[in-house]
Amino acid sequence: DAETHRNIWSWDPYTACVPAAQQGWFVNPSEVKPVFNRRYILMTASGGAVALIRLSDHKLMFYANCGQNPHSAEVLPDGNIVSAESKSGEINTFVVDTVKVLGEKANTVKLGNAHNVVWDKKRSYLYATATKKEGVTALFRFKYDGNRSNPKLINQTTLYTFSNESGGHDLFPVYGEEDKLWLTAASAVYKFDLTGVTDATTNDSTEPTCEKVYSIADIKSICNGPDGIRMLKPTEEWWAEGLVNEKGEELFKMDGAKIYKGRWMIDNLFSYPEKHDFVLSED
């Protein structure tokens, strides 16, 4: 709880009865997106896991291994999942099957140092940042072919290339500002404005505008909501015990925790419809 700093919900692979050989996949959580109207959590972990967990009863609905160091994941319009994995530089798609529960990679796109994926429901694009070459970070977009049983990302396009920025970390919608995305990188925090970017029915590749908002280095995650901005600024190699605002003021702390990301529990209308139901697989 952001106000009381108390733990009001938790999940672990042991009590969820994940097989022992796969429990290590869930070491060091690296993403915690509330999805499907905040009834589920989409998570990744540095041990390799991508997973969808139902909040009400802690049920593990789907999970898979997406590589050596995944940093984020996203829900596609048909309920399938896509992940970003940095070690091998992969954007992987998965067929979500809640009967089988355990899944595997369906298709892979190579994208160097991939750290993030965000769906744009207005334009029907998936966005991701990656390293084109050392010291050069770029924003990419993909179309989704919509094949529920064999999901693929197609039509890769470079939307924006930084002249002097590296290490794209978190890409996340800006609450309250339509068409905008946060990006945290090695030297600063930016906002992309996608207003001029057309939808996926065209082949137009209009470049978004990019504004440096905060000259704060190495922010691992950022999100905002009605109660302001929350950032994860590492106090150790990649983690901290709490979250701060844009002024560096501590807002939340869990003693002994190794936090990599923090998300407000609010609906993400940039990526998902206002009414966003999760459909269970049939036997």
Where are these regions (language model features)?
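WD40 beta-propeller blade core
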Residues: 50-51, 90-92, 140, 190-191
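A short beta-strand motif characteristic of beta-propeller blades
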Residues: 6-23, 58-64, 101-109, 154-163, ...
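Loop/turn-rich, solvent-exposed surfaces of beta-rich toroidal or solenoidal domains
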Residues: 164-247
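Short loop/turn segments immediately following beta-strands, especially the blade-tip
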Residues: 2-3, 95-100, 142-152, 193-206
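Conserved beta-strand positions in repeat-built beta-propeller and related beta-rich domains
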Residues: 35, 42-47, 82-87, 128-133, ...
